[in-house]
């Protein structure tokens, strides 16, 4: 669903619709707006009233409907509005999917640290398949990735997954709220995690690093497509099949997911997150150095390090939250993690990135992004206090 448009939408907006960098950034900031409250609200509903697997299907149905509406729009305001509404119902599905997967592993009495990453790999495989499809498929002689057809493809997949979601193992809900406080009833207990200094610092840096998550999604394809206007790169295979090149990032992600259990047990969450932050520095830096000609190797290296940059933060962070929280607030806690990363982080990061691109252009913008990631890494190393206990990560079987 996401792979059909997340990587290629920026190039369509900038090239096909001639939107500015700030406008392009605003579309990716919709994920931030939605994540500020929708994952937490849906997490509360999943914990208290509607089983997570059913709520997952409902969200995909509604999100797909708004994607269909968005595909027919070309003006900024209506297109932005439809995408915002679609994303509002899509973003909660990430945390809900995690909860449904953890529940299935729990029912099977399997170790989440060991068995969740291999399951999560298939989400990345689907993402890659969708990217290749929109890059290689032409309608009217034009690649889908350069047109609104990418949104129709995503909508179709949303409807398919909605139907499938209803067949997944049932998740429990707690409807017995008579003896609970209103905080428990609303699922707000997860926000009490901010009272714990270590968790508060973890969530704050999740927000700071979350600002980097959507930058290459928004502008990676746009940047590579810009090389097509230069005579020496006009016929470059990298420019023509930029989305396939970018899919190397997801291939790297597929491999790196499998490394998470080892790295978490060996090094702990702090070092794993530091590795992720430094990988983001390289991700942006290599983009700035690279080009479709003599600098092609740097573009490829940027794709290779993406797996470490994304997985070592996103997946490991989710598992860390899973380990640190109780069953009663687990879905809500995953929602809070989403708020900080894909909420505040993505919102401010996407708008800031769009402003930087409009002001500084290419390739200087990449160096600014790399510098930001480096500063966050250095501060995190000194501020986040965590003593790794390998036994804690040896088994997470709730």
Each language-model region and where it sits:
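A membrane-interface helix-boundary motif in multi-pass transporters
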Residues: 136-156, 355-373
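Hydrophobic core of transmembrane alpha-helices in multi-pass small-molecule transporters
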Residues: 63-66, 76-96, 207-208, 297-312
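C-terminal ends and interior cores of transmembrane alpha-helices
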Residues: 61-75, 278-292
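Central cavity-lining transmembrane alpha-helices of secondary-active solute carriers
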Residues: 26-44, 244-259
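Cytoplasmic helix-loop-helix junction between adjacent transmembrane helices
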Residues: 84-122
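Helix-to-loop junctions at the C-terminal end of transmembrane segments
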Residues: 37-51, 138-139, 255-269, 357-358
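Juxtamembrane intracellular "pre-TM" segments in multi-pass secondary transporters
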Residues: 168-204, 229-234, 398
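Helix-loop boundary and gating motifs at the non-cytosolic
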Residues: 1-32, 198-234, 241, 245, ...
């Amino acid at each position: 669903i996401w792979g059909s448009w997340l990587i290629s939408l920026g190039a369509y907006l900038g090239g096909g619709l001639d939107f500015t960098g700030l406008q392009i950034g605003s579309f990716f900031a919709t994920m931030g707006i939605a994540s500020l409250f929708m994952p937490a609200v849906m997490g509360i509903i999943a914990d208290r009233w509607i089983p997570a697997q059913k709520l997952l299907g409902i969200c995909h149905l509604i999100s797909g409907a708004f994607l269909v509406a968005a595909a027919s729009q070309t003006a900024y305001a209506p297109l932005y509005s439809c995408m915002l509404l679609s994303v509002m119902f899509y973003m909660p599905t990430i945390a809900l999917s995690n909860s449904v997967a953890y529940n299935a592993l729990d029912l099977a009495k399997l170790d989440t640290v060991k068995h969740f990453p291999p399951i999560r790999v298939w989400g990345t495989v689907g993402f890659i398949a969708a990217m290749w499809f929109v890059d290689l498929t032409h309608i009217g002689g034009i690649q889908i990735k350069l047109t609104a057809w990418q949104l129709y493809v995503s909508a179709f997949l949303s409807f398919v997954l909605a139907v499938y979601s209803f067949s997944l193992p049932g998740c429990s809900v707690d409807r017995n709220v008579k003896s609970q406080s209103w905080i428990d009833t609303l699922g707000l207990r997860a926000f009490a995690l901010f009272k714990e200094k270590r968790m508060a610092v973890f969530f704050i840096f999740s927000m700071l690093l979350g600002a980097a998550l959507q930058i290459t999604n928004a502008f990676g394809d746009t940047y590579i497509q810009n090389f097509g206007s230069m005579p020496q790169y006009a016929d470059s295979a990298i420019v023509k099949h930029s989305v396939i090149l970018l899919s190397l990032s997801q291939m790297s992600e597929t491999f790196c997911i499998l490394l998470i259990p080892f790295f978490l047990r060996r090094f702990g969450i702090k070092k794993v997150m530091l590795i992720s932050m430094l990988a983001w520095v390289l991700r942006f830096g290599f983009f700035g150095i690279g080009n479709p000609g003599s600098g092609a190797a740097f573009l490829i290296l940027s794709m290779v390090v993406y797996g470490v940059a994304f997985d070592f933060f996103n997946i490991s962070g989710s598992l860390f939250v899973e380990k640190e929280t109780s069953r009663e607030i687990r879905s809500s806690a995953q929602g809070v993690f989403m708020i900080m990363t894909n909420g505040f982080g993505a919102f401010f990061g996407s708008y800031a990135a769009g402003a930087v691109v409009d002001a500084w252009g290419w390739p200087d913008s990449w160096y600014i992004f790399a510098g930001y990631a480096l500063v966050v890494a250095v501060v995190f190393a000194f501020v986040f206090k965590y003593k790794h206990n390998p036994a804690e990560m040896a088994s997470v079987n709730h």
